[in-house]
């Protein structure tokens, strides 16, 4: 049984979160949680929360056994970017893009 958890509009760029997502794709959830716990990146905390939510969803909604679960799919899509302005010299301004991402984790017992 596949169970999904999502975090939309996560305040980190998709490029940075994908680096962390690649670390846990296909692993058992216990091993994936361990990897994320000791990964020293902000994105690891975001992905860990989504993975824990997917595990809780599988246990509560589908009655799955946690020991059998593995990360079947994990993907990160780009979310909307917030546009901000950084004032510069001589009346000019630069545009800053504060990027967001949509993190999706699918856990499965197969």
From Swiss-Prot:
It comes from the Bacteria. GO terms for biological process: translation. Belongs to the universal ribosomal protein uL22 family. One of its GO terms (cellular component) is cytosolic large ribosomal subunit. PANTHER family: CHLOROPLAST 50S RIBOSOMAL PROTEIN L22-RELATED (PTHR13501), LARGE RIBOSOMAL SUBUNIT PROTEIN UL22M (PTHR13501:SF8). Pfam families: Ribosomal_L22. CDD domains: Ribosomal_L22 (cd00336). InterPro entries: Ribosomal_uL22, Ribosomal_uL22_bac/chlpt-type, Ribosomal_uL22_bac/org-type, Ribosomal_uL22_CS, Ribosomal_uL22_sf. This is Large ribosomal subunit protein uL22. GO terms for molecular function: rRNA binding; structural constituent of ribosome. This protein binds specifically to 23S rRNA; its binding is stimulated by other ribosomal proteins, e.g. L4, L17, and L20. It is important during the early stages of 50S assembly. It makes multiple contacts with different domains of the 23S rRNA in the assembled 50S subunit and ribosome. The globular domain of the protein is located near the polypeptide exit tunnel on the outside of the subunit, while an extended beta-hairpin is found that lines the wall of the exit tunnel in the center of the 70S ribosome. Keywords: Ribonucleoprotein, Ribosomal protein, RNA-binding, rRNA-binding. Gene3D superfamilies: Ribosomal protein L22/L17. Part of the 50S ribosomal subunit.
